[in-house]
């Protein structure tokens, strides 16, 4: 469907029309979700070039495309390519939209996750702490994005061996998600697995066994919904 839409928009509107660029972004997103990363990256790179040329490097749609390309690079393990794009996007978003704009908070979270993937834990923790503080202040302590930020900070603490701090945050997040989302919501299950992994890392095996479901380790999360409309998919 996305391929047909892009073909039609390109034929009818031309390759540089905003609707064509939006269709190309959506096809790239679908490729990324399907694990077809090389195809996704090629489309995102083309879109970034076109949007930069047509809209300018600081237009919100250009920032979204740069963020999306960085995410595809990250998924492909190309952290050296992803991190500079995330850094540039955060800088531009902060300057254009403001420090506390939701898209700026998303950009900061994404950069923190990339730093964490690259083993730059001090940098990741600094950004995660700032993002959690801002989300708590702006959205409240129980907003889903705040809970995601708390989960991600706990994950970074855990990677850094700061297990007591990680466990405290994981316990708080699990309690809040169970109360707000219900015990069987996917994010609640993620929190339960992450807390179990932290317990196990701390040698608290009995506590872990009470919670544990198979998991490859503490999972970080994208800010907001799985595919935040403001960051990934154009309408």
Regions found by a protein language model. Name each.
Residues 1-235:
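Intrinsic-disorder-linked linear interaction elements in eukaryotic regulatory proteins
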């Amino acid at each position: 469907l996305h391929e047909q839409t892009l073909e039609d928009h390109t034929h009818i509107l031309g390759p540089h029309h905003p609707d064509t660029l939006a269709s190309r972004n959506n096809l790239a997103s679908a490729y990324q979700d399907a694990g077809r990363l090389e195809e996704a990256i090629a489309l995102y790179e083309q879109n970034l070039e076109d949007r930069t040329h047509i809209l300018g490097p600081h237009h919100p749609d250009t920032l979204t495309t740069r963020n999306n390309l960085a995410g595809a690079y990250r998924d492909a393990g190309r952290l050296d390519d992803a991190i500079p794009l995330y850094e540039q996007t955060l800088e531009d978003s902060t300057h254009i939209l403001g420090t506390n704009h939701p898209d700026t908070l998303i950009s900061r979270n994404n950069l923190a996750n990339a730093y964490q993937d690259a083993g730059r834990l001090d940098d990741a923790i600094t950004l995660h702490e700032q993002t959690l503080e801002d989300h708590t202040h702006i959205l409240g302590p129980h907003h889903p994005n705040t809970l995601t930020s708390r989960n991600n900070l706990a994950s970074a603490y855990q990677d850094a061996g700061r297990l007591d701090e990680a466990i405290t945050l994981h316990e708080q997040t699990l309690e809040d998600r169970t109360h707000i989302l219900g015990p069987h919501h996917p994010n609640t299950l993620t929190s339960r697995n992450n807390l179990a992994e932290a317990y196990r890392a701390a040698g608290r095996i009995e506590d872990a066994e009470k919670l544990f479901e198979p998991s490859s380790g503490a999972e970080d999360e994208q800010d907001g919904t799985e595919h935040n409309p403001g960051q990934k998919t154009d309408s």
